[in-house]
Amino acid sequence: MNTRPDKYRYPAFLGLDETTGRYYILFPDLPGCTTTGDTEDEALASAREALSLHLFGMEDDGDEIPAPSPLTGLRGENGEAVTLIEVWMPSFREKMETKAVNRTVTLPGWLDKEAKIAALNYSQILQDGIMERLKISRQVAKLKKRRIGSPA
Protein backbone atom coordinates (compact mmCIF):
# COMPACT_ATOMS: atom_id res chain seq x y z
CA MET A 1 0.00 0.00 0.00
CA ASN A 2 1.32 3.45 -0.90
CA THR A 3 1.18 5.79 2.09
CA ARG A 4 3.25 8.56 0.60
CA PRO A 5 1.22 11.72 0.04
CA ASP A 6 0.88 13.06 -3.48
CA LYS A 7 1.27 16.65 -2.34
CA TYR A 8 3.32 18.39 0.32
CA ARG A 9 3.02 22.03 1.38
CA TYR A 10 5.62 23.61 3.67
CA PRO A 11 6.19 27.15 4.91
CA ALA A 12 9.44 28.76 3.85
CA PHE A 13 11.33 31.96 4.58
CA LEU A 14 12.31 34.06 1.56
CA GLY A 15 15.05 36.61 2.12
CA LEU A 16 17.73 38.62 0.36
CA ASP A 17 21.39 38.05 1.25
CA GLU A 18 22.81 41.57 1.28
CA THR A 19 26.40 40.35 0.80
CA THR A 20 25.74 38.29 -2.34
CA GLY A 21 22.62 40.02 -3.65
CA ARG A 22 20.97 36.60 -4.06
CA TYR A 23 17.60 35.54 -2.72
CA TYR A 24 17.48 32.54 -0.40
CA ILE A 25 14.81 30.15 0.81
CA LEU A 26 14.89 28.30 4.13
CA PHE A 27 12.41 25.67 5.31
CA PRO A 28 12.08 25.92 9.11
CA ASP A 29 10.65 22.40 9.41
CA LEU A 30 13.33 20.78 7.25
CA PRO A 31 16.85 21.64 8.42
CA GLY A 32 19.31 21.54 5.55
CA CYS A 33 16.67 22.16 2.90
CA THR A 34 17.73 25.52 1.48
CA THR A 35 18.24 27.07 -1.92
CA THR A 36 19.01 30.37 -3.65
CA GLY A 37 18.26 32.28 -6.83
CA ASP A 38 19.24 35.51 -8.56
CA THR A 39 15.62 36.70 -8.43
CA GLU A 40 12.65 35.99 -6.19
CA ASP A 41 11.06 33.95 -8.99
CA GLU A 42 14.24 31.90 -9.47
CA ALA A 43 14.50 31.27 -5.72
CA LEU A 44 10.85 30.17 -5.53
CA ALA A 45 11.22 27.83 -8.53
CA SER A 46 14.41 26.44 -7.05
CA ALA A 47 12.60 25.99 -3.72
CA ARG A 48 10.08 23.64 -5.32
CA GLU A 49 12.90 21.52 -6.73
CA ALA A 50 14.82 21.57 -3.43
CA LEU A 51 11.73 20.64 -1.41
CA SER A 52 10.82 17.81 -3.79
CA LEU A 53 14.36 16.42 -3.71
CA HIS A 54 14.65 16.74 0.08
CA LEU A 55 11.32 15.01 0.72
CA PHE A 56 12.02 12.31 -1.88
CA GLY A 57 15.31 11.58 -0.09
CA MET A 58 13.54 11.37 3.26
CA GLU A 59 10.90 9.04 1.82
CA ASP A 60 13.56 6.89 0.17
CA ASP A 61 15.56 6.67 3.43
CA GLY A 62 12.43 5.85 5.44
CA ASP A 63 12.83 9.00 7.57
CA GLU A 64 9.85 10.42 9.39
CA ILE A 65 8.64 13.51 7.56
CA PRO A 66 7.64 16.26 9.98
CA ALA A 67 4.27 17.95 9.79
CA PRO A 68 4.49 21.48 8.41
CA SER A 69 4.31 24.31 10.92
CA PRO A 70 1.19 26.48 10.80
CA LEU A 71 1.78 29.83 9.11
CA THR A 72 0.34 31.73 12.06
CA GLY A 73 3.12 32.66 14.39
CA LEU A 74 5.94 32.12 11.88
CA ARG A 75 8.27 35.10 11.60
CA GLY A 76 11.52 35.34 9.71
CA GLU A 77 14.57 36.33 11.75
CA ASN A 78 15.86 39.02 9.40
CA GLY A 79 12.66 40.41 7.95
CA GLU A 80 12.22 37.43 5.65
CA ALA A 81 8.88 36.93 3.97
CA VAL A 82 6.93 33.81 4.85
CA THR A 83 5.58 31.84 1.91
CA LEU A 84 4.15 28.41 1.21
CA ILE A 85 5.88 26.05 -1.19
CA GLU A 86 3.77 23.23 -2.59
CA VAL A 87 5.11 20.25 -4.50
CA TRP A 88 3.36 17.48 -6.44
CA MET A 89 5.32 14.29 -5.81
CA PRO A 90 4.03 11.59 -8.22
CA SER A 91 5.69 13.10 -11.30
CA PHE A 92 8.85 13.94 -9.32
CA ARG A 93 9.08 10.39 -7.92
CA GLU A 94 8.68 8.95 -11.40
CA LYS A 95 11.42 11.21 -12.74
CA MET A 96 13.78 10.19 -9.94
CA GLU A 97 12.98 6.48 -10.02
CA THR A 98 13.28 6.13 -13.80
CA LYS A 99 16.38 8.31 -14.00
CA ALA A 100 19.31 6.52 -15.57
CA VAL A 101 22.15 5.70 -13.19
CA ASN A 102 25.82 5.33 -14.04
CA ARG A 103 27.59 2.07 -13.32
CA THR A 104 31.29 1.49 -13.78
CA VAL A 105 32.21 -1.76 -15.48
CA THR A 106 35.58 -3.36 -16.00
CA LEU A 107 36.45 -5.46 -19.03
CA PRO A 108 39.61 -6.49 -20.83
CA GLY A 109 41.14 -3.89 -23.13
CA TRP A 110 40.96 -6.14 -26.19
CA LEU A 111 37.21 -6.63 -25.64
CA ASP A 112 36.65 -2.88 -25.28
CA LYS A 113 38.55 -2.32 -28.54
CA GLU A 114 36.42 -4.90 -30.39
CA ALA A 115 33.22 -3.42 -28.95
CA LYS A 116 34.21 0.07 -30.14
CA ILE A 117 34.95 -1.23 -33.64
CA ALA A 118 31.51 -2.87 -33.67
CA ALA A 119 29.95 0.37 -32.31
CA LEU A 120 28.24 -1.55 -29.51
CA ASN A 121 26.05 0.30 -27.02
CA TYR A 122 27.32 -0.80 -23.59
CA SER A 123 24.29 0.56 -21.76
CA GLN A 124 21.81 -1.34 -23.91
CA ILE A 125 23.82 -4.57 -23.72
CA LEU A 126 24.06 -4.30 -19.93
CA GLN A 127 20.32 -3.58 -19.59
CA ASP A 128 19.46 -6.49 -21.88
CA GLY A 129 21.79 -8.82 -19.97
CA ILE A 130 20.45 -7.86 -16.55
CA MET A 131 16.83 -8.18 -17.70
CA GLU A 132 17.61 -11.59 -19.21
CA ARG A 133 19.33 -12.74 -16.01
CA LEU A 134 16.38 -11.51 -13.89
CA LYS A 135 13.91 -12.95 -16.42
CA ILE A 136 12.27 -9.55 -16.97
CA SER A 137 10.69 -9.05 -20.39
CA ARG A 138 10.72 -5.70 -22.20
CA GLN A 139 6.94 -5.55 -21.78
CA VAL A 140 7.22 -5.99 -18.00
CA ALA A 141 9.99 -3.37 -17.87
CA LYS A 142 7.75 -0.87 -19.69
CA LEU A 143 4.88 -1.58 -17.29
CA LYS A 144 7.16 -1.11 -14.27
CA LYS A 145 8.36 2.21 -15.65
CA ARG A 146 4.77 3.41 -16.13
CA ARG A 147 3.62 2.30 -12.68
CA ILE A 148 6.34 4.06 -10.70
CA GLY A 149 4.80 6.84 -8.67
CA SER A 150 1.26 5.41 -8.90
CA PRO A 151 -0.60 4.31 -5.79
CA ALA A 152 -0.27 0.59 -5.17
Task: Please provide the spans of the model-predicted regions.
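A contiguous binding-surface segment within folded domains or other stable secondary-structure elements
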Residues: 6, 18-20, 36
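Short glycine-enriched loop/turn motifs at secondary-structure junctions
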Residues: 27-30, 97-99
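Short, charged, surface-exposed hinge/linker loops at domain edges
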Residues: 1-10, 48-106, 110-118, 124, ...
